[in-house]
């Protein structure tokens, strides 16, 4: 039985070949050590002690339970339970729906998440910052600060109700571009269709994926990576020019500054030097109040893009 590190490293290595198709992913779910690692990763996270629809928490793990879970995966009798829907308050006074999976589903989802991350993480665009290792809303804000400083036009987008409206068929088709393993695809579809319980009433899910599901963030990034790559391609056709034209008034002041500095080097008395220094201060003040490049240069265009989850 291979260690989880070797399994995941092998997946990452194969994923570097764009044409490679993964055919036997499902058997990774038969590796007990993958569940030990999954347990370690999710045990200490806030919220994982919350009861799912089965009324059990993650501290009830045992080897016999894992063995039973693996057997149900082998014969594909495993069926995810509906998540328990609860509502989390937001800063604006509204609430956000959160689906709490059962204990067994958390374990299986974490194993699937690790597998998908090993395959896809290296192919996501640098413009994507949500739900990724070593990335966060802070790295997204830093990217905005560095990339958008001095820009005149902004388009802010929020995909309304994204997690509730993801098209399952489109998502499955995207997964099939790299995964040629029907059992793995069927398992992911089971998670998407598991539904949820709200006030002990079952609701089917024919689109979307539950916020709170462990595999939902990686599936969201796989889905929205198409948007990221489209924007990258669109920017290639949108961008124009190699260098933005300098602002004429700024260039004039820069030339005047060079002349004054040249005179300052040859000034012979304090009165003359004081006059020139004051002139330099006036020029610098005027320069700082205007852009150094033409703000609306029609011959130079750039499109920049940053995404965090369903906000871009």
Task: Set out the residue ranges of the language-model regions.
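Non-catalytic terminal/accessory segments
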Residues: 1-312
């Amino acid at each position: 039985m291979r260690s989880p590190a070797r399994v995941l490293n092998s997946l990452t290595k194969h994923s570097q070949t764009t044409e490679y198709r993964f055919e036997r992913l499902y058997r990774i779910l038969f590796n007990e050590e993958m569940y030990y690692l999954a347990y370690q990763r999710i045990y200490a996270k806030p919220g994982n002690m919350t009861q799912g629809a089965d009324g059990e928490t993650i501290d009830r793990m045992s080897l016999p339970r894992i063995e039973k879970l693996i057997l149900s995966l082998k014969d594909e009798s495993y069926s995810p339970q509906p998540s328990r829907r609860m509502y989390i308050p937001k800063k604006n006074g509204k609430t956000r729906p959160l689906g709490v999976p059962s204990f067994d589903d958390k374990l299986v989802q974490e194993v699937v998440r690790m597998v998908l991350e090993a395959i896809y993480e290296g192919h996501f665009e640098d413009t994507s910052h949500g739900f990724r290792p070593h990335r966060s809303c802070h790295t997204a804000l830093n990217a905005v600060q560095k990339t958008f400083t001095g820009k005149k036009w902004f388009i802010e987008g929020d995909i309304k109700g994204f997690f509730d409206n993801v098209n399952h068929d489109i998502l499955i088709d995207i997964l099939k571009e790299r995964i040629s393993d029907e059992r793995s695809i069927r398992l992911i579809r089971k998670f998407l269709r598991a539904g949820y319980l709200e006030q002990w009433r079952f609701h089917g899910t024919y689109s979307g994926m539950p916020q709170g599901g462990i595999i939902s963030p990686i599936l969201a990034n796989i889905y929205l990576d198409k948007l990221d790559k489209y924007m990258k391609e669109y920017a290639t056709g949108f961008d124009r020019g190699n260098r933005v034209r300098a602002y004429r008034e700024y260039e004039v002041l820069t030339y005047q500054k060079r002349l004054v500095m040249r005179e300052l080097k040859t000034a012979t008395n304090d009165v003359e030097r004081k006059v020139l220094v004051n002139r330099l201060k006036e020029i610098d003040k005027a320069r700082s109040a205007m852009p150094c490049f033409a703000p609306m240069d029609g011959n130079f265009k750039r499109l920049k893009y940053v995404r965090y989850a369903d906000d871009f």
